[in-house]
Curated annotation (Swiss-Prot):
HAMAP family with a match to the protein in the record: CbiM
Subunit structure: Forms an energy-coupling factor (ECF) transporter complex composed of an ATP-binding protein (A component, CbiO), a transmembrane protein (T component, CbiQ) and 2 possible substrate-capture proteins (S components, CbiM and CbiN) of unknown stoichimetry.
Pathway: Cofactor biosynthesis; adenosylcobalamin biosynthesis
Record localization: Cell inner membrane
Principal subcellular localization: membrane
Name of the gene this protein is made from: cbiM
The name this protein goes by in its record: Cobalt transport protein CbiM
Length: 254
């Protein structure tokens, strides 16, 4: 059990260090995470129920990676801190809302989506408790969009590009960018399901929510893709001995 918790300790330290930076610069805007108490209780419970099985699988994958190579704990913590910092940067939107990167693509590519789901939930929990981003009742919904849907789409895109013999930088870029966008698509769907339009129903609400975030999220996704490629390349160069010939542990960490 101690072996499993060690990466969480490193992740906690990394997150607390990042908090100092975020508290020094924090724009006056609400984070894109669904805020505490915003969803009806039935929908909050629904998303929690969908999220829990992924966490169980994620814990098993995480334990498998740590047991195989304890030196991976530092990179696991770094992947979590990367997601924490990026998803805490709130960018105001001209539509009156705000958007932010997610940072989950890096961990999904390196370790697989199941592991990133656990790291993502930890990130969201810290943000809810320490930064008032999101909330505890909506943690299941936020986790499903950012810690599950985003990483699984990122992983799927990455594997698809690798199998098609695409350049690695392109595979990582598309994985991070499309995974970021998918997080917002799922969040928009969650809001549309909970608050359907009186006239157009769920479809109208979905279009409205997606339009609100599209103006800022598309350029943010591109920027996140570029940054993720840079960080991934640095990891491959300076920590290549920790990874198999494929360059990632994604297959082992699914």
């Amino acid at each position: 059990m101690k072996t499993i918790l060690r990466p969480f300790t490193l992740l906690s330290r990394s997150i607390f260090l990042a908090l100092f930076v975020l508290f020094l610069w924090s724009p006056d805007a609400h984070a894109m995470h669904i805020m505490e108490g915003f969803l009806p209780p039935s929908w909050s419970l629904f998303w929690w129920v969908l999220t829990l099985p992924f966490l169980v699988v994620g814990f098993r994958s995480l334990r498998k990676i740590v047991d195989a190579n304890p030196r991976m704990k530092l990179l696991l913590a770094m992947a979590g801190a990367f997601a924490f910092v990026l998803s805490s940067l709130k960018i105001p939107s001209v539509t009156g809302s705000c958007s932010h990167p997610t940072g989950v693509g890096l961990g999904a590519v390196l370790f697989g989506p199941s592991v990133m789901s656990v790291l993502g939930v930890i990130v969201l929990l810290f943000q809810a408790l320490l930064l008032a981003h999101g909330g505890l009742t909506t943690l299941g919904a936020n986790a499903f969009s950012m810690a599950i849907a985003g990483p699984f789409v990122s992983y799927g895109i990455y594997r698809l590009m690798v199998m098609s013999k695409a350049p690695e930088w392109l595979a990582v870029f598309l994985a991070a960018a499309i995974g970021d966008l998918m997080t917002y698509v799922v969040t928009s769907l969650q809001l549309a399901l909970a608050f359907p339009s009186v006239t157009g129903g769920i479809a109208a609400s979905l279009g409205k929510f997606m339009t609100i975030f599209a103006l800022t999220q598309v350029p943010l996704a591109i920027s996140e893709g570029i940054l993720t490629v840079m960080v991934f390349s640095a990891i491959r160069e300076y920590a290549s001995e920790l990874f198999p010939a494929s360059g990632t542990l994604a297959k082992e960490g699914v």
